[in-house]
A protein has these predicted regions:
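Structural motif at the C-terminus of the N-lobe alphaC helix and the adjacent alphaC-beta4 loop
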Residues: 251-260
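C-lobe/activation-segment region of protein kinase-like
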Residues: 354, 359-410
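Activation segment signature within eukaryotic-like protein kinase domains
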Residues: 319-320
């Protein structure tokens, strides 16, 4: 984090990224002295409600973060920034998004947790748009012009007021990761699964160290008494995340049920002193690790893999089969995961894998309707992306014939005609038919 003192003293000349979070109520004009080099400007966590009309005087500005401020309108000056491609205004009080605020190279727009009820039609005139984060607003519909955004891969529209998912949305050729929980359109969760989940008293848990923390909650190690069984406890936060509501995530975890490639839910915590929602889950063996890291600002919708990550055909096939199997399982239960990515998969050296993080999960009808099929085939594209990433990293055992089969499957999963893609059951059957040597 940089300081205002450094900025005003001229000590930041030549920097490409500036991070200022110090209670700012107005944009420091000294930022313009960095115009020759500044590419990423992070002004999140201040008290700003406007930006200067001449923001375009930062000609190299590519990324602007202004989350957790006091904006009521997306500033129109953004549209004049020729190179600006990523805009983040999460958790403001934005009600109005003028068309003038949309820069021509817009690729990634974050408007999570605001008060937006309408988006401009001109949003569909941004052909590079790839990632659109709109969870936690007041949207009852989306601009039909978004049908023109053929590069749009990730949409978060959870916790809005949508009564239907438009046909054009489900036909977008590149759409891969969709989250729409907490809208009137979403099917009700499987109450039977919810009822069958045991209640575990808070008093029966001895909490230990923190194992991890994400946007939706904190995971802690614990001992479950009276048997002192080691478990993991996920304590859910109440606020809206980029994916949607943490409580919807909890509901999806319960409804997902049992599968070898899911982390088992032991029960729901009751009697927390602050009434905090929590689940008790199996403790994962330390031999498991994340398959990939989150996308970067540059990669946008693609995970980052360690350069040294390599697999044998047997290990890659075992992971691909596991994820296809759990995908089919979830779809049979009327659940789309919404965030099927390497960074949400834990794996070990044998190729055993677990799909986690249900923050973007949504419920759909289990009947075989065109809408259900489209929702499921959108997720199959995510599997196709993952399969391609695994294929790139196989270093042992891959014959030309097997490569052709896997590349053919990957192409079918990612083809632009959504309903022509295979379902997960067909994908799983094909993967099972491939010899491992």
């Amino acid at each position: 984090m940089n300081t205002l003192v450094q900025l005003k003293a001229g000590q930041l000349a030549g920097i490409q990224r500036l991070d200022l979070s110090c209670g700012l109520t107005e944009f420091p004009r000294e930022i313009f002295e960095l115009a020759d080099s500044l590419e990423i400007l992070n002004l999140s966590g201040n008290a700003l409600s406007s930006l200067p009309d001449d923001l375009h005087r930062l000609p190299h500005l590519r990324v602007l973060f202004c989350s957790d401020n006091a904006f009521t309108e997306l500033p129109a000056c953004l549209g004049q920034c020729a190179k600006l491609s990523m805009i983040g205004f999460k958790a403001n009080r934005i009600r109005h998004v003028p068309a003038a605020a949309l820069p021509p190279l817009l690729r990634w727009l974050i408007l999570t947790d605001n008060c937006i009820s309408q988006l401009p039609d001109e949003l569909g005139e941004r052909p590079l748009l790839q990632k659109l984060m709109l969870a936690g607003n007041h949207l009852a519909h989306l601009p039909p012009s978004l049908a023109n955004c053929h590069n749009l891969e990730l949409i978060r529209i959870a916790s809005n007021r949508l009564t239907g998912l438009p046909d054009w949305l489900l036909a977008l050729p590149s759409l891969t990761w969709l989250a729409y929980a907490g809208n009137p359109v979403e099917m009700a969760a499987d109450v039977a699964a919810d009822d069958a989940t045991p209640d575990i008293p808070w008093s029966a848990l001895e909490l230990a160290e923190v194992l991890g923390e994400g946007a939706s909650g904190v995971i802690r190690k614990a001992l479950w008494q009276p048997s002192a069984k080691p478990v993991a406890v996920k304590l859910y936060k109440g606020s809206i995340t980029s994916d949607g509501s943490p409580l919807h995530e909890m509901q999806a975890c319960i409804a997902a049920g049992l599968h070898p490639n899911l982390i088992k839910v032991e029960g729901r915590v009751v009697g927390h002193p602050d009434d905090q929602a929590a689940l008790v889950m199996d403790l994962i063996e330390p031999s498991y690790r994340n398959l990939a890291a989150l996308p970067s600002l540059a990669s946008c919708t693609r995970d980052i893999y360690e350069p040294a990550t390599r697999f044998s055909l047997a290990v890659a096939l075992r992971m691909a089969r596991g994820i296809a199997s759990v995908g089919a399982h979830l779809h049979r239960h009327g659940i789309t995961h919404g965030d099927l990515y390497g960074h949400n998969i834990l794996w070990n050296a044998a190729g055993d894998c677990l799909l986690g993080d249900f923050g973007a999960a949504s419920f759909h009808a289990t009947a075989d309707t065109v809408e259900t099929r489209a929702l499921q085939r959108i997720e199959v594209r995510a599997f196709g992306v993952l399969l391609g990433e695994l294929l790139q990293r196989i270093d042992v055992g891959l014959s030309d014939t097997t490569r052709q089969i896997l590349e053919g499957l990957q192409a079918r999963c990612c083809q632009p005609e959504v309903l022509a893609r295979p379902g997960f059951e067909e994908v799983e059957a094909l993967l099972q038919s491939i010899p491992q040597h």
